[in-house]
């Protein structure tokens, strides 16, 4: 049996481009992909903090250090330049793999530059 777990998260990234006529996907600064462990063409989920939209696409690599988060194709109707998004990738793990499992969490500033990384989300206080 496999359990689907959060593999990686880019937390509160800012959309820098929205290209309706592009082939599709989401272009992400390559240094962010590397830090999070998200592979080019990997399926990702995008959660738009501004409007509540949640959608699936795949990652493509943008220039390292560029800060680019470009939502392309039909998904461009779901995210505008300046919107804050959470980008997640998931992985299926078997019971043996779960014991050592830790997600890659990447936190960015308003220019999509890495401010910190973590492998755990703090317990939410009531």
From Swiss-Prot:
InterPro entries membership: Asp_de-COase-like_dom_sf, Asp_decarbox
Keyword line: Autocatalytic cleavage, Cytoplasm, Decarboxylase, Lyase, Pantothenate biosynthesis, Pyruvate, Schiff base, Zymogen
Gene3D superfamilies: 2.40.40.20
NCBIfam families listed in its UniProt record: panD (TIGR00223)
Keyword Cytoplasm: yes
Cofactor: pyruvate
Assembly information from the UniProt record: Heterooctamer of four alpha and four beta subunits.
Cofactor binding annotation: Binds 1 pyruvoyl group covalently per subunit.
Gene that this polypeptide is encoded by: panD
Organism (species): Methylococcus capsulatus (strain ATCC 33009 / NCIMB 11132 / Bath)
EC number in record: 4.1.1.11
Residues that coordinate or bind substrate: 57, 73-75
PTM annotation (Pyruvic acid (Ser)): residues: 25
Pathway: Cofactor biosynthesis; (R)-pantothenate biosynthesis; beta-alanine from L-aspartate: step 1/1
Molecular function as annotated in GO: aspartate 1-decarboxylase activity
Name of the protein this chain belongs to: Aspartate 1-decarboxylase
Record note on modification: Is synthesized initially as an inactive proenzyme, which is activated by self-cleavage at a specific serine bond to produce a beta-subunit with a hydroxyl group at its C-terminus and an alpha-subunit with a pyruvoyl group at its N-terminus.
Enzyme class: lyase
Family as reported in the entry's similarity comment: Belongs to the PanD family.
GO biological process: alanine biosynthetic process; pantothenate biosynthetic process
Role summary: Catalyzes the pyruvoyl-dependent decarboxylation of aspartate to produce beta-alanine.
Catalyzed reaction equations: L-aspartate + H(+) = beta-alanine + CO2
Active site: residue positions: 25 (schiff-base intermediate with substrate), 58 (proton donor)
């Amino acid at each position: 049996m496999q359990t689907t777990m959060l593999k990686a998260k880019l937390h509160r990234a800012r959309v820098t481009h929205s290209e309706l006529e592009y082939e599709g996907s989401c272009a992400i600064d390559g240094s962010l992909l590397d830090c999070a462990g998200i592979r080019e063409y990997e399926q990702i989920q995008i959660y738009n903090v501004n409007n509540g939209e949640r959608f699936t696409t795949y990652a493509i690599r943008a220039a390292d250090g560029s800060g680019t988060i470009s939502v392309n194709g039909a998904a461009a109707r779901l995210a505008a330049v300046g919107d804050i998004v959470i980008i997640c990738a998931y992985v299926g793990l078997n019971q043996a793999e779960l014991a050592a499992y830790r997600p890659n969490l990447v936190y960015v500033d308003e220019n999509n530059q890495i401010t910190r990384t973590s492998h755990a989300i703090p317990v939410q206080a009531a």
